[in-house]
Each structure stands twice: as structure tokens, then as C-alpha cells.
């Protein structure tokens, strides 16, 4: 299993225009409190905008950065599930930039990648936060040890001076004797890289294992060598500053003298800190570590020391029309060790790859990452003996500030039924947080791209099971269990295991069929094309829409028409409602009648539109049900959304006929692809019933239902 987590893109932003996924043609998109479809977001001035295309080649959009994407603004954009604050929480220069998206013209490799393998359109990031918390979920299953621990929902909550210490998944693999490794060109802990060197060569602090104390990152060779250089050079720097201060004072320039003395004092403090660190981290203390501790460190911080140029840049020169342009690029192979291990058949059972910033797809850097993904795929597929037993997972840590139209499924607060309910025995205390001026479920966060490449996920399919970053851990657990190894990440909460799958529904038998692979990208050509866009005009956004514009707008045209094969999913979901007195009683069930032990639990979002859009969250374990009640006023409108576009709406009024509608699956334990609608008339009068198929074109049916029938 090879996992590459890239940076900061939402699903709609990347793949909303891809054929056959739940993108801009979603027939059951969320409705906002103001009655508009979810696409039409309103800013603080009251102006409403729709999604619009960002032209990567015709503008400099990939050079102008990203959007707010911290705990506060992610929580605010969701707005307790109402989902109507995106433009207010994610501002950028008074433009509706969050609604910008790309299509196949801009991302040809990624679309070809999805067409060749399986793209997942119900994959959410793990938390309503930024990079580091989401990456903590990928490597450890949580953002804290337990519900009593502080929730590390901000990037700065976990850092070199705020280390974590709970057990991580690589440690569990190590204890079970399962090989693993984290590949990067160079770590982020200071090793002397500066400016563009850091952007092209270091791992962009995207390996959060650097911040777990048990991995002892300060023993890293590059960092210790940097300390040695600093300790050797700083005394002269300090002496020069002190001499400069004396000279300035003698010349009567007291302010300059004080500035030099201040700088010298700072350098003395740095020298003292470096010397103290060298006492703790040196060859002698390294040799005193246990073999296990050394192995954890070496595997977590596997860098490209074997390439003599791995810390060097060179200049790429190219022609852009009549202009000759230059751009710094890595001189060495940023995938050197991963390439070498793959070619020699030495890849471990589980590998994580961490890209440098400029290859990470992060909006803070130009979008060079397509080459990096292409190169990883090319490395894996060049060795048939490796490829025939490899699963390559491409995922993204978070959405940055880019809009996605599917509200995430989140955990309800324990003991607060107004926020939702779960099956009995699911404690969500660890899944919610009050931190940094916000109270919110920690996750799930917004949808992000997830593509799984392997011989068993070929063929351009779409998978619509709910996944998050812990799904990658669960995949490894399931795979190892099939090999007789019991490795379980206990940091993953029961709620998260109930609602998020293990990716196994993606895979199907492989019998040697030919696979059409995306054409590998050339590194320099990719860089040239993206770098040249730096000199284009800024992107333009769509205009503000009137009420008439909103009514007539059709966002579906942004998405490619057609369908793609869909992976079968073991969801057997039933949601029914009936009136009891002054309440609407809604039952949500995840049955096991058809799929048995393979049946999935499911999350649901409940929307009460007649009360200004109040939102409740549910989690139903397979084989169980959850029931909730909603007051009935003069009118009621309750909508329940589940995975894969599952939706039930119940709408009426206090004085309407009391007719109960039940929808199930025809065919019993051998479903035939049809639904079965049962009507129960609890009213005192016979009722005329119309059954209207609004999706698949079946003819209108009329029924007369007697009282009590």
C-alpha cells in the first residue's frame, strides 16, 4: 500500500466537472435556508454568486495563493450544517474565489488518472480544520489521545515546541512486524535550506510524525549537521556584531550600536540553544537508543541522502514566446529513495510519500504536483512485479478554502439530542470539540479528491461509499487481517468506524486484463507550462446574480455529461416517517438483511426546513436503527440525506391527510434493483394518491386508498 497525501483541494474544485461523479449535475443537491440551491452562495454585501471556472493556462490563478482554511473559518463556512456562509467565511479580495473550479482542460492528467482507475466522490477530509490535524488522522487516527485531551484542531497546536506523544499507526505496524517507511526528499526541521531550496526540497511540514516525541526528529543527520555548522560559525558572527556596535557607538550612532548589540544578543541566545541541543542529540546519545527507537526514527524520516544533489537546485531555462524565462528546479531526484526501493523490489508493506511544497498541489505554490503524482505512478507501474501487488492511494488532506457542495456528515454532541443521535453504544465525546473560540464537531470535514490506483481498481469507476483519512488506516488493517496479522488503530473512534469505510468496496478481481494508464508527464515541460502562467492576467469571477438569474442558471453544464461504472456498495438504508400526535417520528435504519456481515453502517444529515433550517446529525451502526421526532406545525418539511445521494423528504401540514409512506427494496434478500412503496392510510377518509417518478421517467400512477388500508 502506497499513500500519497497532497494538499488543499476540494472535490468540486478539482473533480466537480468530471463525468459520472456527484459534481455539478447532482440531482439532489442541498437546499440553503433561503431556498436557493447550494451552488448559489451569498456574500456579506448580499450579492449571490455561482461556481465558475478558473482557467489555469489562460490566467495566473495558480500563482495567486489560496483562501482561509483554519478551524474557525471551516466551522463558520459549515454554519452548523446550514452551509450558507462560504463567501463570508472564505473572503479573498472581494471576489467569490472560493467558488472557483477547474475542469479537464486545466487538469488533464488528473482526469486521465480518474478515468483509468477509481475516483471516490464521497471521500471527506477527517476534520473541519487545516493541514496538520487532518494529517494527524492519516497517521494516527485522531487529533488527541482521548476525549479528555486537548483537541489539536489548529495547525499550531502540534509543532516542534508542542509535540504530541500518543501512539501512531506506524508504531503499531512496527510492533506487529510489518514493514513501513515514510519517504520525503528532506524533512522540515531546520537543516539549513533557505527560500526556494526549502520550497522545492523539504517536506513542507507535511510529515506530522516530525512532531511526535517518540520519533526523536532532532537526531536527523541533516539537522545535526546544521547545528554543527551554526555552533562553529556563530561565535564569529557574534564577535563581528559586537565590534560593529563598538564602532557605531564611537561614531556617535547610538541607535545603530543598540541594534547591533540586540542582534548579537539574539545570536548568543541561538548559540546557547544550539549547544544545549547538541548535548542531548549527538552520536553518543543516539547510540544509547534502543534498536526499536532507532528504527522508528530511520523509517519515519527516510530522505534522499543517496542522491548527491538532493539538497541542490539548478536553473531551468525555456522560451515563452519571444521571452526567455528561468525558474529554479531540483537538481537531484526528489523521489530517489522511493524509486530505488521500487526498482529493487524493496518497497515496504506500507509506504507514505510526502512531497515538497512546490510539488504538493498546495495553492501557496504553483500547481506542479501533477508531475509528482504522474512520476509516482510511473515508478510503480514500470516494475510489473511491484505493480501486480500494489495499491496506490492519492488523497488530499483538506479543501483549503475551496467550496464543495456536499455537506459533510458530522458527529452529534453526546447528551445533546437537539444535535442528533447515534446507535446505542457509540460515544462521540472524542469527536466533538470546544476550542479556539468555536464549538463544533471535529469532523468529518469537506469532500476532497481520492483516487485509488491498482490492478483491482482499474477501469474508470466511481465509488460512493463514505470515506475519510482513517479509511486508509482501515484498509491496511483489513489487508493485514487477511494475512493473519491483527493490527488495529485504537485511536479511531467508534463513530468514525461506523460512518467511514475501509476502501475495500473499491476493489474487484483482476484477471490480467490490459490497463490503459495515463501518459507520464515530463517534469520540465510541466514546470515550464505552469511557470509561464505566472505572467498571464489575473482570473476573473462570475458576476453577481439576480433572483431571475438564479432561477434560470444551470450549473449542470459545468460538468461533463454521461455516467461511469459505479462500485456496488453494501448499504441497505431505510428511512421512514409517520405522524404521531403533534410529532413526525422518523426512523433511520441500516439493515443487514441482504449483505449480512458485510453490511455498512451509515451517517445521515437531518434538515428541518420549517424551523429556519435546523440540522441534526445521525450515525446508525449496521443492523440497528435510530429514531428521532420533529414537531409538526401548520407546515413541516424534514429532509434526511445519507451516503451516495440517498435522500428522503417528508413535507406537509397539520391539517393534511395522515398517510404513511414506506419505501424499501423489492426482492427481499435478492434485491432486483427496484424499490417497493407501501402506503398506509391512517386518516378517517379515503385518499387519492399520486406516485410521481421525478428521476427515471416511469409513468405517473394514481391510487385510491381507503381509510385504514
Language-model-derived ranges and their functions:
Residues 1-709:
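N-terminal pro-sequences and low-complexity stem/linker regions of secreted or lumenal proteins
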Amino acid at each position: 500500500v502506497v499513500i500519497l497525501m497532497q494538499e488543499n483541494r476540494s472535490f468540486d474544485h478539482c473533480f466537480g466537472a468530471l463525468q459520472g461523479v456527484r459534481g455539478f449535475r447532482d440531482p439532489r443537491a442541498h437546499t440553503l435556508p433561503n431556498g436557493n440551491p447550494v451552488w448559489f452562495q451569498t456574500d456579506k454585501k448580499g450579492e449571490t454568486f455561482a461556481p465558475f471556472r478558473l482557467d489555469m493556462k489562460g490566467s495566473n490563478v495558480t500563482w495567486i495563493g489560496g483562501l482561509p482554511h483554519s478551524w474557525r473559518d471551516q466551522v463558520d463556512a459549515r454554519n452548523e450544517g446550514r452551509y450558507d456562509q462560504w463567501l463570508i467565511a472564505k473572503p479573498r479580495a472581494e471576489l467569490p474565489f472560493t467558488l472557483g473550479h477547474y475542469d479537464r482542460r486545466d487538469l488533464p492528467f488528473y482526469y486521465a488518472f480518474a478515468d483509468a482507475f477509481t475516483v471516490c466522490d464521497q471521500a471527506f477530509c477527517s476534520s473541519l480544520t487545516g493541514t496538520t490535524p487532518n494529517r494527524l488522522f492519516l497517521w494516527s487516527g485522531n487529533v488527541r489521545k482521548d476525549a479528555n485531551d486537548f483537541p489539536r484542531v489548529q495547525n499550531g497546536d502540534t509543532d516542534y515546541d508542542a509535540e504530541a506523544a500518543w501512539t501512531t499507526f506506524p508504531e503499531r505496524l512496527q510492533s506487529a512486524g510489518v514493514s513501513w517507511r515514510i519517504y520525503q526528499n528532506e524533512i522540515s526541521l531546520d537543516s539549513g535550506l533557505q527560500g526556494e531550496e526549502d520550497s522545492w526540497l523539504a517536506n513542507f511540514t507535511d510529515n506530522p510524525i516530525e512532531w511526535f516525541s517518540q520519533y526523536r526528529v532532532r537526531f536527523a543527520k541533516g539537522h545535526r549537521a546544521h547545528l554543527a555548522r551554526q555552533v562553529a560559525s556563530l561565535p564569529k558572527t557574534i564577535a563581528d556584531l559586537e565590534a560593529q556596535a563598538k564602532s557605531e557607538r564611537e561614531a556617535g550612532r547610538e541607535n545603530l550600536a543598540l541594534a547591533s548589540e540586540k542582534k548579537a544578543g539574539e545570536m548568543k541566545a541561538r548559540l546557547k540553544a544550539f549547544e544545549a541541543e547538541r548535548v542531548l542529540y549527538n552520536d553518543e546519545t543516539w547510540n544509547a537508543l534502543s534498536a526499536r527507537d532507532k528504527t522508528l526514527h530511520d523509517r519515519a524520516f527516510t530522505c534522499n541522502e543517496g542522491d548527491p544533489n538532493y539538497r541542490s537546485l539548478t536553473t531551468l531555462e525555456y522560451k515563452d514566446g519571444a521571452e526567455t524565462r528561468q525558474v529554479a528546479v531540483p537538481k537531484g531526484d526528489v523521489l530517489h529513495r522511493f524509486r530505488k526501493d521500487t526498482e529493487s523490489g524493496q518497497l515496504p508493506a506500507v509506504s507514505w510519500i510526502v512531497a515538497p511544497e512546490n510539488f504538493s498541489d498546495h495553492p501557496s505554490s504553483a500547481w506542479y504536483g501533477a508531475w509528482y503524482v504522474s512520476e509516482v505512478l510511473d515508478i510503480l507501474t514500470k516494475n510489473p512485479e511491484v505493480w501486480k501487488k500494489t495499491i496506490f492511494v492519492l488523497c488530499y488532506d483538506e479543501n483549503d478554502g475551496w467550496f464543495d457542495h456536499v455537506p459533510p456528515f458530522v458527529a452529534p454532541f453526546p447528551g445533546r439530542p437537539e444535535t442528533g443521535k447515534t446507535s446505542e453504544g457509540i460515544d462521540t465525546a472524542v469527536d466533538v470539540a470546544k476550542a479556539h473560540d468555536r464549538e463544533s464537531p471535529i469532523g468529518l470535514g469537506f469532500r476532497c479528491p481520492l483516487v485509488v490506483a491498482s490492478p483491482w481498481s482499474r477501469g474508470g469507476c466511481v465509488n460512493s461509499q463514505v470515506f475519510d483519512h482513517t479509511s486508509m488506516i482501515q484498509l491496511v488493517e483489513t489487508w493485514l487481517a487477511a494475512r493473519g496479522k491483527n493490527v488495529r488503530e485504537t485511536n479511531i473512534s467508534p463513530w468514525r468506524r461506523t460512518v467511514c469505510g475501509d476502501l475495500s468496496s473499491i476493489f474487484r478481481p483482476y484477471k490480467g486484463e490490459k490497463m490503459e494508464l495515463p501518459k507520464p508527464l515530463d517534469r520540465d515541460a510541466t514546470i515550464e507550462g505552469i511557470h509561464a502562467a505566472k505572467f498571464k492576467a489575473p482570473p476573473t469571477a462570475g458576476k453577481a446574480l439576480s433572483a431571475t438569474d438564479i432561477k434560470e442558471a444551470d450549473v449542470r453544464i459545468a460538468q461533463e455529461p454521461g455516467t461511469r461504472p459505479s462500485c456496488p456498495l453494501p448499504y441497505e438504508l431505510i428511512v421512514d416517517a409517520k405522524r404521531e400526535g403533534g410529532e413526525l417520528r422518523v426512523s433511520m435504519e441500516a439493515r443487514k438483511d441482504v449483505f449480512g456481515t458485510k453490511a455498512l453502517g451509515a451517517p445521515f444529515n437531518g434538515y428541518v426546513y420549517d424551523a429556519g433550517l435546523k440540522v441534526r446529525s445521525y450515525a446508525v451502526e449496521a443492523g440497528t436503527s435510530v429514531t428521532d421526532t420533529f414537531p409538526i406545525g401548520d407546515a413541516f418539511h424534514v429532509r434526511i440525506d445519507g451516503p451516495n445521494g440517498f435522500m428522503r423528504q417528508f413535507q406537509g401540514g397539520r391539517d393534511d391527510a395522515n398517510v404513511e409512506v414506506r419505501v424499501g427494496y423489492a426482492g427481499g434478500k435478492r434485491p432486483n434493483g427496484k424499490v417497493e412503496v407501501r402506503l398506509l392510510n391512517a386518516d378517517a377518509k379515503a385518499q387519492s394518491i399520486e406516485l410521481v417518478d421525478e428521476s427515471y421517467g416511469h409513468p405517473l400512477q394514481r391510487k385510491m386508498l381507503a381509510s385504514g388500508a
